[in-house]
Amino acid sequence: TAARRKNAAAFEPRLRDSRLELVQAGAGTRPGWLRMPARLKSGNVQALGGDSRARSLGIYPSYPELLDQLPGMAERTMERTDGFPGAKELTQHLLTLPTHSAVKAADLQAIIVWAGGTP
């Protein structure tokens, strides 16, 4: 967990002016950062499937589609009248960055460069 927190902390100041907006931890919390969630400011994260550089760096979209669009789930979804705009936003813009202990300084640097952050 210490390595994950250290790696997550390295992203914060260096991605401020990038194409990503990091999801902030709640006040008074100390997350373990299994992965660092970030919002793509423009574009669609599903396009990352074709971005071999992003995939090689461990950058992945979080949610491929809305739950009510998954096979067998539509009939189990109750409130479908509003189209789930918040969930749709997540499927289009939320991605995660790796924070595990095998992420080295060069990996962090490459992720920051990929995101257009400050090296």
Model-flagged regions — what are they?
Residues 1-119:
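PLP-dependent aminotransferase class I/II
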